[in-house]
Regions:
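Surface-exposed helix/loop patches within compact recognition domains
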Residues: 10-115
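Short, glycine-anchored, charge-dense loop/turn motifs used at functional sites
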Residues: 176-182
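Boundary/junction segments of secreted and surface-exposed precursor proteins
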Residues: 1-17, 162
Length: 186
């Protein structure tokens, strides 16, 4: 088991998933962000070095480079080895019945952007690569209501919203679209 040599990652987490933000800023200048899929099939762990904790969204807004400097304003690049606990600790991994699967990713370069969404809640976006330069793109959005929820105009159509793999999509007259109107049929 090691860093995945292939298989680009495109993953979205939402408030439907298990999200935990742990504040260690007072003792270690550290914030740990953990996201585990609702069905417990995969998990991501990010270590943010920060001297402050944002009481509204947890992690202060900004762009955090992924590296090994341990400096404030960065995210720890994963070496994959937790020597203290004698364990393998990837940044993103798959699980099945509590056991690791072969597909693991160790983020070694890139960045994590933290911002507030339109509802003022946490929006996190990872653009990284692992040691094999496999592209990794992960988004977490804490959700919140938007003006779109109550809009109803024009003729009635066979249209509904659906959540697929953590991504909000629109099914209209049998065709699947993303939120900007792109046809998702590939």
């Amino acid at each position: 088991m090691g860093d995945a040599s292939e298989g680009d990652v495109e993953r979205t987490y939402s408030s439907q998933d298990h999200i935990q933000i742990t504040d260690y800023t007072k003792t270690n200048s550290l914030i740990i962000f953990e996201a585990e899929s609702e069905v417990e099939s995969d998990m991501m762990v990010l270590y943010f070095f920060s001297n402050t904790f944002d009481n509204q969204i947890g992690i202060p807004e900004g762009e955090y480079p992924i590296n090994s400097s341990l400096l404030p304003g960065t995210v720890l690049a994963s070496t994959g080895i937790d020597e203290e606990n004698n364990a393998v600790t990837p940044s993103l991994y798959s699980t099945f019945d509590g056991e690791y699967l072969d597909r693991m990713y160790f983020f070694v370069d890139g960045s994590v952007n933290i911002s507030k969404n339109d509802a003022g809640k946490l929006h996190l976006e990872v653009n990284a690569v692992n040691s094999y330069l496999v592209p990794i793109h992960i988004v977490y959005d804490a959700g919140g209501t938007t003006d779109v929820e109550d809009i109803h105009k024009g003729n009635n159509t066979n249209t509904q919203k659906m959540l697929l793999n953590g991504q909000l999509l629109i099914l209209r007259n049998g065709t699947l679209y993303d939120l900007v109107g792109r046809n998702m049929k590939k």
